[in-house]
Regions:
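Charge-rich, low-complexity N-terminal segments
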Residues: 2-153
């Protein structure tokens, strides 16, 4: 698009003139959260409670809103921050009862599936798509658990 396209076509909306755009959040400086989890039915050490300093990047594609952006970055970080300093478990994990008994149930996130990086990326994407405006056509979330493991959905 030429620089003058937005200036000359003042009767058109931003979305009509600009088309779809992609907003990348965390590309050079990932969003970081610290969360604990365990994979209940795993045969190895991941079945024990442990934590990670997750690094999350997000790409959001859509047409521009009247405010001139694809989505408000704060809306992205608000969804991710819900898991910061929380413990993620699968429904049915005995730790749910332990957290409730200890009075710490507010620090627990119960998922329908094992809390792997792969599942986390899917759930975060779904939550974002549900809460973002209809102008958003696609969301991609990458969850880096370690330097060796990154899941993208």
């Amino acid at each position: 698009m030429t620089r003058s396209a937005l200036r000359e076509d003042q009767d058109s909306t931003l979305s009509e003139v600009a088309g779809e755009r992609t907003l990348r959040i965390g590309e050079d400086n990932p969003i970081r959260i610290s969360s604990g989890h365990r994979i209940l039915h795993h045969d190895g050490k991941c079945s024990r409670p442990h934590g990670h300093n997750y690094e999350i990047t997000v790409e959001v594609t859509g047409t521009l809103t009247d405010d001139g952006w694809v989505v408000d970055k704060g809306d992205v970080t608000d969804i991710i921050d819900e898991w910061d300093h929380r413990f993620l478990v699968q429904a049915g994990d005995p730790l749910v009862e332990a957290f409730e008994t200890s009075g710490d149930s507010d620090s627990l996130i119960v998922l329908d599936h094992p809390p792997t990086a792969e599942v986390m990326s899917v759930i975060l994407e779904e939550r974002m798509l549900e809460s973002f405006p209809d102008t958003v056509s696609n969301v991609s979330v990458a969850v880096r658990e370690t330097g060796e493991l990154c899941a993208t959905y």
